[in-house]
Amino acid sequence: SEKVKAIIKTLDTPYIIPEGGANALGVLGCEEISNSERNYDIFISACGTGSTLAGIINGMKKNQYAIGFPALKNASFLNDKINCFLNQKNQNWHLELDYHFNGYAKQKPELIKFIQEFWISHGIRLDPVYTAKAMFGLFDLIKNGSLKNKKILFIHTGGLQGVSGFESRYKVVL
Protein backbone atom coordinates (compact mmCIF):
# COMPACT_ATOMS: atom_id res chain seq x y z
CA SER A 1 0.00 0.00 0.00
CA GLU A 2 1.02 3.62 -0.35
CA LYS A 3 1.04 4.08 3.41
CA VAL A 4 3.55 1.24 3.86
CA LYS A 5 5.76 2.63 1.07
CA ALA A 6 5.73 6.05 2.75
CA ILE A 7 6.82 4.55 6.08
CA ILE A 8 9.60 2.55 4.39
CA LYS A 9 10.98 5.73 2.80
CA THR A 10 11.49 7.25 6.26
CA LEU A 11 13.76 4.39 7.36
CA ASP A 12 17.51 4.11 6.71
CA THR A 13 17.84 0.47 5.71
CA PRO A 14 14.59 -1.33 6.39
CA TYR A 15 14.38 -5.08 6.27
CA ILE A 16 10.90 -6.30 5.50
CA ILE A 17 10.10 -9.72 6.91
CA PRO A 18 7.63 -11.53 4.67
CA GLU A 19 4.48 -13.07 6.06
CA GLY A 20 5.29 -16.29 7.87
CA GLY A 21 9.01 -15.51 7.73
CA ALA A 22 8.96 -17.21 4.33
CA ASN A 23 12.40 -16.37 3.01
CA ALA A 24 15.94 -17.74 3.18
CA LEU A 25 16.72 -16.03 6.50
CA GLY A 26 13.53 -17.33 8.11
CA VAL A 27 14.39 -20.84 6.99
CA LEU A 28 17.97 -20.45 8.21
CA GLY A 29 16.74 -19.38 11.65
CA CYS A 30 14.58 -22.49 11.91
CA GLU A 31 17.52 -24.80 11.17
CA GLU A 32 18.63 -24.31 14.76
CA ILE A 33 15.53 -26.13 15.98
CA SER A 34 16.66 -29.49 14.61
CA ASN A 35 20.39 -28.82 14.54
CA SER A 36 20.95 -29.57 18.21
CA GLU A 37 22.77 -32.11 20.32
CA ARG A 38 19.52 -33.78 21.30
CA ASN A 39 18.72 -36.76 19.16
CA TYR A 40 15.06 -36.70 18.27
CA ASP A 41 13.73 -39.19 15.75
CA ILE A 42 10.89 -37.02 14.51
CA PHE A 43 10.15 -33.29 14.40
CA ILE A 44 6.53 -32.15 14.20
CA SER A 45 5.42 -28.68 13.16
CA ALA A 46 2.35 -26.84 11.98
CA CYS A 47 2.68 -25.34 8.50
CA GLY A 48 1.48 -22.06 7.05
CA THR A 49 4.11 -21.03 4.51
CA GLY A 50 6.29 -24.09 5.07
CA SER A 51 9.40 -22.11 6.00
CA THR A 52 9.59 -23.44 9.57
CA LEU A 53 9.40 -27.02 8.34
CA ALA A 54 11.98 -26.33 5.61
CA GLY A 55 14.42 -24.99 8.20
CA ILE A 56 13.85 -28.00 10.42
CA ILE A 57 14.50 -30.33 7.48
CA ASN A 58 17.69 -28.45 6.55
CA GLY A 59 19.02 -28.82 10.09
CA MET A 60 18.18 -32.50 10.51
CA LYS A 61 20.64 -35.36 10.60
CA LYS A 62 20.23 -38.12 7.99
CA ASN A 63 18.46 -40.48 10.40
CA GLN A 64 15.84 -37.92 11.46
CA TYR A 65 12.39 -37.27 10.01
CA ALA A 66 9.99 -34.31 9.90
CA ILE A 67 6.22 -34.16 9.61
CA GLY A 68 4.32 -30.98 8.81
CA PHE A 69 0.63 -30.34 9.42
CA PRO A 70 -0.69 -27.61 7.09
CA ALA A 71 -3.41 -25.34 8.43
CA LEU A 72 -4.68 -24.90 4.89
CA LYS A 73 -7.10 -27.05 2.96
CA ASN A 74 -5.70 -28.43 -0.33
CA ALA A 75 -2.15 -27.64 0.80
CA SER A 76 -0.23 -30.11 -1.37
CA PHE A 77 1.30 -27.06 -3.13
CA LEU A 78 3.42 -26.62 0.02
CA ASN A 79 5.50 -29.63 -1.03
CA ASP A 80 7.00 -27.57 -3.87
CA LYS A 81 7.40 -24.45 -1.71
CA ILE A 82 9.25 -26.42 0.96
CA ASN A 83 11.45 -28.16 -1.62
CA CYS A 84 12.52 -24.73 -2.95
CA PHE A 85 13.97 -23.88 0.48
CA LEU A 86 15.83 -27.14 1.02
CA ASN A 87 19.65 -27.16 0.86
CA GLN A 88 19.64 -30.62 -0.66
CA LYS A 89 17.13 -33.16 -1.81
CA ASN A 90 15.76 -34.72 1.35
CA GLN A 91 13.09 -37.40 1.39
CA ASN A 92 12.92 -37.64 5.19
CA TRP A 93 9.75 -35.60 5.54
CA HIS A 94 6.13 -35.41 4.50
CA LEU A 95 3.00 -33.34 5.00
CA GLU A 96 -0.10 -34.70 6.72
CA LEU A 97 -2.80 -33.06 4.61
CA ASP A 98 -5.91 -34.31 6.44
CA TYR A 99 -5.82 -32.28 9.66
CA HIS A 100 -6.83 -28.84 8.36
CA PHE A 101 -10.33 -28.93 9.92
CA ASN A 102 -11.94 -27.26 6.88
CA GLY A 103 -9.01 -24.92 6.22
CA TYR A 104 -7.25 -21.82 7.48
CA ALA A 105 -8.87 -20.29 10.59
CA LYS A 106 -11.73 -22.77 10.31
CA GLN A 107 -12.82 -25.08 13.09
CA LYS A 108 -14.87 -28.10 13.97
CA PRO A 109 -16.32 -28.99 17.38
CA GLU A 110 -13.83 -31.86 17.82
CA LEU A 111 -10.90 -29.42 17.44
CA ILE A 112 -12.39 -27.00 20.00
CA LYS A 113 -12.94 -29.87 22.43
CA PHE A 114 -9.35 -31.05 21.88
CA ILE A 115 -7.95 -27.56 22.60
CA GLN A 116 -9.99 -27.27 25.79
CA GLU A 117 -9.04 -30.75 27.03
CA PHE A 118 -5.38 -30.22 26.15
CA TRP A 119 -5.31 -27.02 28.23
CA ILE A 120 -6.94 -28.78 31.20
CA SER A 121 -4.68 -31.85 30.95
CA HIS A 122 -1.35 -30.20 30.15
CA GLY A 123 -1.64 -26.50 31.03
CA ILE A 124 -0.47 -25.55 27.54
CA ARG A 125 -2.50 -23.30 25.27
CA LEU A 126 -2.89 -24.19 21.61
CA ASP A 127 -4.00 -21.76 18.95
CA PRO A 128 -6.90 -23.00 16.80
CA VAL A 129 -5.43 -21.89 13.46
CA TYR A 130 -2.11 -23.76 13.41
CA THR A 131 -0.73 -25.46 16.51
CA ALA A 132 -3.90 -27.22 17.69
CA LYS A 133 -4.36 -28.85 14.29
CA ALA A 134 -0.78 -30.14 14.34
CA MET A 135 -1.07 -31.38 17.93
CA PHE A 136 -4.38 -33.08 17.14
CA GLY A 137 -2.68 -34.77 14.18
CA LEU A 138 0.26 -35.84 16.32
CA PHE A 139 -2.07 -37.39 18.91
CA ASP A 140 -3.90 -39.19 16.10
CA LEU A 141 -0.65 -40.61 14.67
CA ILE A 142 0.41 -41.74 18.14
CA LYS A 143 -3.00 -43.38 18.67
CA ASN A 144 -2.79 -45.33 15.42
CA GLY A 145 0.68 -46.58 16.35
CA SER A 146 2.65 -45.08 13.46
CA LEU A 147 5.07 -43.25 15.80
CA LYS A 148 5.65 -46.08 18.25
CA ASN A 149 8.97 -45.97 20.13
CA LYS A 150 9.99 -42.67 18.52
CA LYS A 151 11.54 -39.72 20.32
CA ILE A 152 9.42 -36.79 19.11
CA LEU A 153 9.89 -33.03 19.33
CA PHE A 154 6.72 -31.01 18.75
CA ILE A 155 7.48 -27.40 17.84
CA HIS A 156 4.87 -25.05 19.31
CA THR A 157 4.95 -22.18 16.82
CA GLY A 158 2.79 -19.80 18.84
CA GLY A 159 -0.20 -18.10 17.26
CA LEU A 160 -1.77 -17.41 20.64
CA GLN A 161 -2.37 -13.75 19.79
CA GLY A 162 -5.30 -14.87 17.64
CA VAL A 163 -7.09 -16.83 20.35
CA SER A 164 -9.22 -13.96 21.70
CA GLY A 165 -10.43 -13.04 18.22
CA PHE A 166 -11.24 -16.67 17.50
CA GLU A 167 -13.14 -16.99 20.78
CA SER A 168 -15.12 -13.86 19.99
CA ARG A 169 -15.88 -14.92 16.43
CA TYR A 170 -16.98 -18.46 17.27
CA LYS A 171 -18.42 -17.76 20.75
CA VAL A 172 -16.21 -20.39 22.41
CA VAL A 173 -13.73 -20.40 25.26
CA LEU A 174 -10.43 -22.09 24.48
Place the predicted regions along the sequence by residue.
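A broadly conserved detector of short glycine/acidic/proline-rich loop/turn motifs that flank catalytic sites
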Residues: 21, 130, 158-159
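Small/polar-residue-rich loop-to-helix segments that shape phosphate-bearing ligand pockets
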Residues: 1-39, 91-114
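Generic secondary-structure signature for well-ordered alpha-helical cores
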Residues: 9-13, 35-39, 58-62, 84-91, ...
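Glycine-rich phosphate/pyrophosphate-binding loop at beta-loop-alpha junctions
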Residues: 25-102, 155-174
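Nucleotide donor/acceptor-binding cores
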Residues: 41, 149-150
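General beta-strand structural signal in soluble alpha/beta enzymes
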Residues: 15-19, 43-45, 95-96, 124-128, ...
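Active-site-adjacent helical/loop segments in soluble small-molecule enzymes
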Residues: 99, 103-149
